[in-house]
Amino acid sequence: MAAARPVLARALLQQCLFARLQVKPPEHGAEAEWEEIQRGLVIYICFFKGADEDLVPKIVNVLLNVKLSEDENGEYVSVLDLPGNVLIIPQATLGGKLKGRKMQYHTNIEKEKGMELYSQFVSLCEKELAANPKCMEAGVLVKHGTYGNRQVLKLDTNGPYTHLVEF
């Protein structure tokens, strides 16, 4: 029996009607900063040790083209065909493994490399939506969180449509 190939990235996909992510907390009298989207897809992403730049296009292709959303006819379509907005959230906790009663994150990628891959992932998602005629016409957007920061999320979802995808 062949050895299982290691997981290099994990993404959690969640449909939304509205999502709002705090990317900067309030400080020194300044208001908090938020990113928000209307109907679309929230993508939580985590990279593991061994992940590299070659993996990013595959992840983007799969996640933006998977048919998870219902259109007005009840047909399942991708976020590109909907067309819908995308909110990307870096989520290192997706790399956790339960050991006893604690979570461990030994397989997560190093912070600097993870930040680099996350930036490439966001950029490629932006390019894919910008190159899609339906998305361009509808004016849909890619918004994203800040890598390495704690962030507050408010989410309105249209069902328990949460999917875990490993690469």
UniProtKB/Swiss-Prot annotation:
InterPro entries: Daa-tRNA_deacyls_DTD, DTD-like_sf. It is found in: Cytoplasm. A motif (Gly-transPro motif, allows the protein to recognize chirality of D-amino acids) lies at residues 159-160. It is an enzyme of class 3 (hydrolase). Keywords: Cytoplasm, Hydrolase, RNA-binding, tRNA-binding. It catalyses: a D-aminoacyl-tRNA + H2O = a tRNA + a D-alpha-amino acid + H(+); glycyl-tRNA(Ala) + H2O = tRNA(Ala) + glycine + H(+); D-tyrosyl-tRNA(Tyr) + H2O = D-tyrosine + tRNA(Tyr); L-alanyl-tRNA(Thr) + H2O = tRNA(Thr) + L-alanine + H(+). Belongs to the DTD family. A Gly-transPro motif from one monomer fits into the active site of the other monomer to allow specific chiral rejection of most L-amino acids except L-Ala. The trans conformation of the motif is maintained by Arg-150. This is D-aminoacyl-tRNA deacylase 2. The gene is DTD2.
